[in-house]
């Protein structure tokens, strides 16, 4: 901060304080806002928040109610912590809350045209259709099945080598490598090699982008700090953007050269980059896109499909290790349905209801993205309260998953609650129709990759259960603390010694 900026803050602070509070108090007198904790001028309720914001919101909700109004600096917000309220906001008033929160970092890194943050409209609808029908349609998911199968086999072989050498493995990193390779090959036909390949560089950049998106930037919340880079945040996200742009430009130029030389075949099985280049080169396309759109859309998918899936797999394994009875039931189901002569395949997973229940229970307790964030585009009234346009909505799905009014013994890992005879029926899905379980969101803004994610989760978890035990080096229970950020991974990496089960070599050799 330079001297002039410091003088500005010191000598004009009282004036800013007065000007800031006056209109806010006047507006409040004419609105019926939800309950709110005590606040301070300028910072509002920011002092109530710790590093794990979803947990801070949960604590506030237990004290002030399931619908609360907050002012984060100069940004009005509401926090929702029950399924009924989530339904009121996300379904009954879906169009009013169809926009997403933006930030200085998000707008810069994503070229201002990211699908994930685009307003609901023609462009958003076109890209959503491209995602769901073309890239993630049943035909294309089947086309990419060999890629998913190969990457899972590579993971299992890596773990088998570590097992025989009795060496520790960082399973957190191995799962990230797996999910990144699957997504990178679907996007751009590249994979991590461990030798500074383009895919390795992309993986590292995606992790950096995810960290940036999840970090608090005072310039996004205190209006008079907007042009003051107090945290050095701007320099960081601009540098990340430059590196990502240079990487994608190299990849796109290489692909364009291959297309000119006729090395890319027409027809089925194109990756997403080819699909986007087809749109770019099509003069009659419904929507005109640029190279910046292509780069932003690829980043959308890389960030959405890499960390989240790996985090979900890791949490499921951690809970199974901490709950050995559930782990044993899962193995019994695999033995009965599949046997011990071959690996579980994607086509088997619908016949493994306990594995599906494990996934639902892990996503209930540990949603990889703990909150759904929307922004209102118009004034609305919800349950008698005024919600002004421009209000940020936080639906705390982490809190909903721990709500004792929704779940019996909510802090316990009990997969059987999702089976017939449990607390809930197995028909309770995770695709956004049941508002007590929303790990993939709901409605128009629901995750378009839910089918791919569930295929990966099911087969990877089943294969890891089938082939290995885990020596966590003397720990009785694995740590379940979370790390702060846009996502909610474990606070510490999952490092263990994989223990090969009796028939692992035979099973791997037969596949």
Swiss-Prot record:
Question: Can you say where in the cell this protein is located?
Answer: Membrane
Q: In which pathway does it act?
A: Secondary metabolite biosynthesis; flavonoid biosynthesis
Q: Which GO terms describe its cellular component?
A: membrane
First-tier enzyme category under EC:
oxidoreductase
Entry's Gene3D superfamilies?
Cytochrome P450
Q: Is this entry keyworded Transmembrane?
A: yes
Give cofactor(s), names only: heme
UniProt membrane topology term: Single-pass membrane protein
Residues that coordinate or bind heme? 447
Residues spanning the membrane: 4-24
What Gene Ontology molecular function terms does this protein carry?
heme binding; iron ion binding; monooxygenase activity; oxidoreductase activity, acting on paired donors, with oxidation of a pair of donors resulting in the reduction of molecular oxygen to two molecules of water
Q: What is the species of this protein?
A: Gerbera hybrida (Daisy)
- Per the UniProt entry, the Enzyme Commission number(s) are 1.14.19.76
- Which family does the entry's similarity section mention? Belongs to the cytochrome P450 family.
- What name does the UniProt record give this protein? Cytochrome P450 93B2
Q: Which GO terms describe its biological process?
A: flavone biosynthetic process
Give UniProt keywords alphabetically.
Flavonoid biosynthesis, Heme, Iron, Membrane, Metal-binding, Monooxygenase, Oxidoreductase, Transmembrane, Transmembrane helix
Q: Which reaction does it catalyse?
A: a flavanone + reduced [NADPH--hemoprotein reductase] + O2 = a flavone + oxidized [NADPH--hemoprotein reductase] + 2 H2O + H(+)
Q: Does the keyword Iron apply?
A: yes
Name the job this protein performs. Answer: Functions as a flavone synthase II (FNSII) that catalyzes the direct conversion of flavanones to flavones. In vitro, can convert liquiritigenin, naringenin and eriodictyol to 7,4'-dihydroxyflavone, apigenin and luteolin, respectively.
């Amino acid at each position: 901060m330079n001297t002039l900026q410091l003088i500005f803050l010191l000598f004009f602070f009282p004036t800013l304080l007065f000007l800031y509070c006056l209109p806010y108090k006047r507006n409040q007198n004419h609105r019926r806002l939800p309950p709110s904790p005590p606040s301070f001028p300028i910072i509002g309720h920011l002092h109530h928040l710790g590093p794990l914001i979803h947990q801070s919101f949960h604590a506030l909700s237990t004290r002030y109610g399931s619908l609360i109004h907050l002012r984060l600096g100069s940004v009005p917000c509401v926090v929702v912590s029950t399924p009924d309220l989530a339904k009121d906001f996300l379904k009954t008033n879906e169009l009013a809350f169809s926009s997403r929160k933006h930030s200085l970092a998000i707008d810069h890194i994503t070229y201002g045209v990211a699908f994930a943050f685009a307003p609901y409209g023609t462009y958003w609808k076109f890209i959503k259709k491209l995602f769901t029908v073309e890239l993630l349609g049943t035909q294309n998911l089947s086309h990419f099945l060999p890629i998913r199968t190969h990457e899972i086999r590579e993971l299992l072989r890596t773990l088998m080598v570590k097992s025989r050498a009795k060496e520790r493995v960082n399973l957190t990193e191995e799962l990230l490598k797996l999910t990144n390779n699957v997504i990178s090959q679907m996007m751009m036909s590249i994979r991590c090699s461990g030798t500074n390949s383009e895919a390795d560089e992309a993986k590292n950049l995606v992790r950096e982008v995810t960290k940036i998106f999840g970090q608090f930037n005072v310039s996004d919340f205190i209006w008079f700090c907007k042009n003051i880079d107090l945290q050095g945040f701007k320099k960081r996200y601009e540098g990340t953007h430059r590196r990502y742009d240079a990487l994608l430009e190299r990849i796109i130029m290489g692909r364009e050269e291959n297309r000119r030389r006729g090395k890319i075949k027409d027809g089925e099985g194109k990756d997403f980059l080819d699909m986007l280049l087809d749109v770019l080169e099509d003069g009659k396309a419904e929507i005109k896109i640029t190279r910046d759109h292509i780069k932003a859309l690829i980043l959308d998918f890389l960030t959405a499909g890499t960390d989240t899936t790996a985090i979900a797999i890791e949490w499921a394994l951690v809970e199974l290790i901490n709950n050995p009875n559930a782990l044993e039931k899962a193995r019994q189901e695999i033995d009965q349905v599949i046997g011990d002569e071959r690996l579980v395949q994607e086509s088997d997973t619908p016949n493994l209801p306990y594995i599906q229940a494990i996934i639902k229970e892990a996503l209930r307790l540990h949603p990889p993205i703990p909150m759904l964030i929307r922004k209102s585009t118009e004034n609305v009234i919800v349950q008698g309260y005024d919600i002004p346009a421009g209000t940020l909505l936080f639906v705390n799905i982490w809190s909903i998953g721990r709500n004792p009014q929704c779940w019996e013994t909510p802090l316990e890992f009990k997969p059987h609650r999702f089976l017939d005879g449990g607390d809930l029926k197995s028909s309770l899905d995770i695709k956004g129709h049941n508002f007590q379980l929303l790990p993939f969101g709901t409605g128009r803004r629901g995750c378009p990759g839910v089918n791919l994610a569930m295929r990966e989760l099911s087969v990877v978890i089943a294969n890891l259960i089938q082939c290995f035990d885990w020596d966590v080096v003397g720990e009785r229970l694995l740590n379940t603390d979370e790390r702060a950020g846009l996502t909610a991974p474990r606070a510490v990496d999952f490092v263990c010694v994989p223990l090969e089960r009796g028939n692992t070599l035979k099973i791997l050799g037969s596949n």
